């Protein structure tokens, strides 16, 4: 059987969407790698805040099979937002242990 990984990004809209998004694909994948900027800064360099305690609790409740890994890294190294986007997605992809890697934004739902 082919094993599947998912990467997703934790940012300003994570409390609204991320857990719901993950719930839609959780049972179909073997690994979920989430990236969050260590300084809580967007790719454009703007600070953001989320309710981390609530989010981590929500993700913990979903993650009965221990599939979720959270990576904290400096994902705003460039002054060009799209370069930071590419860097983060490629970095997270490199952390995956499976050959099939899917990328879902927090506000994207698998139907």
Task: Please state what every model-predicted region is.
Residues 1-27, 34:
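N-proximal low-complexity "stem/linker" segments adjacent to membrane-targeting elements
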Residues 7-9, 102-106:
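Short catalytic-loop micro-motif centered on adjacent basic/acidic residues
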Residues 14-15, 40, 108-110:
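Short acidic, S/G/P-rich loop/turn micro-motifs used as interaction or catalytic elements
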Residues 19-23, 98, 111:
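Short alpha-helix within the catalytic core of nucleotide-sugar-dependent glycosyltransferases
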Residues 29, 96-99, 106:
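Short, well-ordered alpha-helix to beta-strand connector turns
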Residues 33-35, 103:
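Acidic beta-strand-to-loop metal/phosphate-binding motif
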Residues 37-100:
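Active-site-proximal specificity loops/subdomain of glycosyltransferases
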Residues 90, 104-111:
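Acidic donor-binding/catalytic loop of UDP-sugar-dependent glycosyltransferases
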């Amino acid at each position: 059987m082919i094993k599947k990984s998912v990467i997703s990004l934790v940012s300003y809209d994570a409390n609204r969407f991320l857990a719901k998004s993950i719930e839609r694909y959780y049972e179909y994948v073997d690994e979920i790698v989430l990236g969050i900027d260590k300084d809580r800064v967007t790719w454009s360099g703007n600070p953001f805040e989320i309710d981390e305690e609530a989010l981590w609790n929500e993700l913990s409740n979903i993650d009965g099979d221990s599939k979720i890994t959270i990576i904290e890294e400096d994902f705003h190294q460039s002054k060009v937002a799209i370069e930071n986007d590419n860097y983060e997605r490629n970095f997270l992809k490199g952390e995956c242990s499976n050959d099939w890697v899917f990328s879902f934004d927090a506000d994207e739902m698998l139907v």
